[in-house]
From Swiss-Prot:
Designated name of the protein: Ubiquitin carboxyl-terminal hydrolase 4
Domain annotation Rhodanese: ranges: 205-328
Gene: DOA4
Membrane topology value: Peripheral membrane protein
Provenance organism: Saccharomyces cerevisiae (strain YJM789) (Baker's yeast)
Residues that span the membrane, as ranges: none
Length: 926
């Protein structure tokens, strides 16, 4: 088998003209070998025992090779050359791992013998016969293999090696292309990025690349390409008659010494890259500089054999529009020496402003009912927060924040005093000039009852943009047919951290920022003959909305109901779409297209808007059919599913999937597409000193600070609507030392406790199980940094931030994919106040006071109203998904089953034993 795989890998390398194969290519080889050795021929009749033996044999080879791979990777990290034989061993080992993984996780679970053994294990607690002993041994072997795969540390290193090697190969190829180019040629942003990356990793004694920015020093200081060796040569500082000596002695006379030294070494660089902006004079001077360096370098002649001079195609504007537009830096004075953790050490919060939050967020229309008025004067949980400020009659009155937190959002414009209204409650969270805001809302005047805008100062109403502008932006921002180049969005058990930027509440609860929630609100055989494997988007497909005419003044009926066709086991997708569209705030921004203005094509984890725009298209199609149709109809979400599959291959085929995983993927993907901070650098880890100080703070304060740090890298409307946070605290039983991490969530997965024969299980029981203090087993004990060894320890989760819309996943499947069918009783009105961290003790970090930490809507009580239930029937391998969704007072609850939907006669039907994912939104005054 080994020689066969090696031969296949070599053939593929020759075919692709590459020393390395990609992860996808190696996975395809593994799948082919499984078909060849496991499924076809004589292997077709192999039983569970034979498959397990095959896996054990392959695993032993994998483990043996892993020892050699550690040495290979270690040598590579030290800069040593890697032989072709070593590369083959690494690629071979990946194929071995993938073969075992596919057999254990896919092939074996589909064996009838495996299903019978699981059934016997779950239904029989008696008997010790040979058959049962044999079955027990087989299951032990299977579980051991599965655990070995999950805990294997080598595969991550192998994948990292393969990916980095492929990246380096690509860089080398592009650099070779540059080596063949002549001085004076134009290079693309891709080629420049390759040269910069190659230079950063180069071990050569020759200096690699020097960039010369031909713009004014002011523009250069504002923003320039981020690289080590770069100088600014102002276009006005030289002329055609200059030589290289004149450039050094005259043009650079006021430049920093570091730039002068770089220019003095210009003839030692392998590449010199010139770039400027679109200014006509600057472009002309760029040509003049090229001529000086090539033809008038008398003091230090530049040889084309040693140093090549290129011009950046499309200049700096082209670089900004490219995939590397985020790789820019500023030379202006800054606080770059301030660490992210300085807020804990000396109370300096200005470090957070280094990563800019967006100026705008999507606008959402909504009305506040009378229950909100009561909340506006409710007390806050922090001792130092005062009651609501009296209404100000002066229209120029603007509430401000104090101390260093004013710097946090210093890039935003102040609100226009003319937009203020003396009849509105003076809510600082809606008028702070220096804070970003998540969502502008509409709320009635508490005196007149009229619908007046509550203005987030920096956020215009997006629906005022014309449809023409929207369509233009669509075409400019996205090539809809570039699915093949989309990086996958990896769905996690709890979605990737995402944050919102809701402004600070001053003196009283921030409830209006939460009032968006005031609105009420599969695994089956295919019901369609369409084969997903045949589905494709033609080159003519585009995301136009010519079939819909959204206007700024249109009053959408957000409670529309339309069925969705099953494309082959796609009920898992249909039920989640129906529930998600029960979230009025989200539906609104995709109907009025205000989302489009916030697509961030430079977001590192986004799909360049593919997912968001095809989701918008689906919402428009559903709304149009509901509006125009006179009877119950359904539509096909085929193109949306294709878009999902292009982003994550898990949803590409017609195989069965978990609806909660799709829910996490969808919200995570929409967030990344709309993430206004998606190109910001990641947060630095806290120093030991900062972490020690954080541990002394209450969860209430520490979690607020961590949320503020979070905001600097992730901010979108998805975050603002669905994001929460919990704390995970480890505690040593010997010395009582603690360590706490703060984890954001979009879908909160809670366990189902064991059923007490006397009592039913409630969702509150599940939350108690989720937040209980857990004693860690011997093999899970924490390595206490204070004791410097593993000690008896505990772990406890605490919810520190509850979102506007809470999605709860009932964990019905265990690690062996067995389903817990116990009836979990969940109410229409859920109170989670007891589970929210409310431990504020009056202690703040040094130098920080109560005026500086935003509350961001975290004011109890936390009551939630049910508006959606995704139900699962059957097993994970053969079941079906449906949904109950609340569609307002007029339509009430509807039951969705793919293409079919019907009113629910008794709303109590929404409370049922098949509930799997629950959708709640926060309500007030109840």
């Amino acid at each position: 088998m080994e020689q066969n795989i090696i031969s296949t890998i070599r053939d593929e390398c020759i075919r692709h003209r590459s020393k390395y194969l990609t992860i996808a290519q190696l996975t395809a080889i593994a799948e082919a070998k499984i078909n060849e050795f496991i499924i076809t021929g004589k292997a077709k009749d192999q039983d569970l025992s034979s498959l397990l033996d095959k896996c054990i044999d392959i695993l032993s080879i994998y483990k043996k090779n892993s020892k050699d791979i550690k040495n290979i990777i270690s040598c590579k990290n030290k800069g040593a050359m890697i032989s072709s034989n070593s590369v083959m061993i690494i690629q071979l080992n990946y194929v071995y791992y993938k073969v075992i993984h596919i057999i254990v996780t896919t092939n074996i679970p589909h064996l009838s013998e495996f299903a019978k053994i699981k059934l016997h294990k779950s239904t029989s607690d008696e008997g010790n016969g040979n058959n049962n002993n044999n079955e027990f041994q087989l299951m032990n072997i299977y579980n051991t293999l599965l655990e070995t795969l999950l805990k294997d540390e080598n595969i991550a290193k192998i994948k990292s090696f393969i990916k980095s090697s492929i990246k380096q190969t690509k860089l080398n190829h592009e650099q070779e292309e540059c080596n063949l180019m002549r001085t004076g040629s134009y290079i693309t942003s891709n080629q420049l990025n390759s040269l910069i990356s190659s230079s950063a990793n180069s071990t050569s004694s020759q200096m690699e690349i020097l960039l010369i920015d031909i713009r004014s020093r002011l523009e250069f200081n504002k923003s320039h390409i981020d690289t080590k060796n770069i100088i600014c040569l102002e276009p006005i500082s030289f002329k055609m008659s200059y030589s290289d000596h004149d450039l050094e002695k005259k043009s650079l006379i006021t430049s920093p010494n570091s730039e002068i030294k770089m220019f003095q070494s210009r003839n030692l660089f392998k590449f010199i890259i010139l770039y400027t902006d679109a200014n006509e004079y600057n472009v002309k001077q760029q040509s003049v500089l090229l001529d000086i360096l090539v033809n008038h370098s008398f003091e230090k002649p530049i040889s084309d054999d040693f140093t090549k001079i290129f011009i950046l195609e499309s200049g700096f504007p082209g670089w900004l529009k490219s995939n590397y537009g985020s790789q820019v830096s500023s030379s202006s004075p800054s606080n770059n020496n301030i660490k992210d953790d300085s807020v804990y050490i000396n109370g300096n919060t200005s470090g957070l402003s280094l990563q800019h939050l967006p100026k705008m967020s999507p606008s959402i229309r909504h009305s506040m009912d009378d229950s909100m008025k009561e909340m506006l004067v409710a007390p806050t949980p922090l001792n130092h927060l005062q009651q609501q400020q009296q209404q100000q009659s002066d229209n120029d009155h603007v509430l401000k924040r104090s101390s260093s937190f004013k710097k946090l959002f210093s890039n935003y414009t102040s609100p226009n005093p003319k937009n203020s209204n003396s009849n509105l409650y003076s809510i600082s969270s809606l008028s702070i000039s220096s804070s970003p805001s998540p969502l502008p809302l509409h709320s009635p005047d508490p005196v007149k009852g009229n619908s007046l805008p509550i203005n987030y100062p920096e956020t215009p109403h997006l629906w005022k943009n014309s449809e023409t502008d929207f369509m233009t932006n669509q075409r400019e921002q996205l090539n809809h047919n570039s699915f093949a180049h989309i990086a996958p969005i990896n769905t996690k058990a709890i979605t990737s951290p995402s944050r919102t930027a809701t402004p600070k509440l001053q003196r009283f609860p921030q409830t209006i920022s939460m009032n968006l929630n005031m609105n009420s609100n599969g695994h089956s055989s295919a019901t369609s003959t369409i084969q997903p494997s045949c589905l494709s988007l033609s080159n003519n497909d585009s995301l136009d909305h010519t079939d819909v005419t959204p206007t700024s003044s249109h009053n959408y009926d957000l409670d529309f109901a339309v069925g969705l066709e099953n494309l082959g086991n796609s009920c898992y997708m249909n039920c989640i779409i129906q529930c998600i569209l029960g979230t009025h705030e989200l539906t609104q921004i995709f109907l009025d297209d205000s989302y489009a203005k916030h697509i961030n094509i430079n977001s590192k984890l986004g799909s360049k808007g593919i997912l968001a725009k095809y989701f918008a298209r689906l919402v428009h199609m559903m709304y149009k059919e509901q509006v125009d149709g006179s009877k119950k109809i359904s539509i096909s979400p085929i193109k949306f599913k294709l878009a999902c599959g292009s982003v994550n291959s898990l949803f590409k085929t017609a195989s069965q999937q978990d609806c909660q995983e799709f829910c996490q993927f969808l919200l995570d993907g929409l967030h990344e597409d709309l993430n206004q901070c998606g190109s910001n650098p990641p947060l630095k880890e806290l120093s030991q000193e900062a972490e020690a100080r954080r541990e002394k703070l209450s969860l209430r304060i520490a979690s607020s600070i961590e949320w503020e740090r979070f905001l600097t890298t992730d901010f979108s409307v998805i975050v603002d609507l669905f994001q929460g946070q919990y704390a995970s605290r480890l505690k040593c039983k010997v010395c009582s030392h603690t360590s706490t991490t703060y984890q954001p969530f979009t879908v909160l997965s809670i366990p189902i406790p064991k059923k007490n024969s006397r009592n039913n299980i409630t969702i509150e029981d599940c939350f108690r199980e989720f937040t209980k203090c857990e004693n860690l087993e011997v093999d899970e004990q924490w390595l206490c940094p204070h004791c410097k060894k593993r000690q008896p320890s505990t772990k406890q989760l605490t919810i520190t931030r509850l979102p506007r819309n809470l999605i709860v996943h009932l964990k019905r499947f265990d690690n062996l994919l067995n389903k817990n069918n116990d009836f979990v009783i969940y109410p229409f009105l859920l109170d989670l106040t007891p589970f929210w961290a409310n431990d504020f003790d009056g202690v703040f970090p040094p130098g920080v006071n109560d005026d500086e930490l935003p509350i961001r809507g975290q004011i109890p009580p936390f009551k939630y109203e049910l508006y959606g239930v995704a139900c699962h029937f059957g097993t994970l391998y053969g079941g079906h998904y449906t949904a109950y969704v609340k569609k307002g007072l007029k339509k009430g609850w509807l039951y969705f089953d793919d293409t079919k939907y019907k009113p629910v006669k008794n709303k109590a039907d929404a409370i049922n034993s098949n509930a799997y994912v629950l959708f709640y939104h926060r309500v007030y005054g109840v």
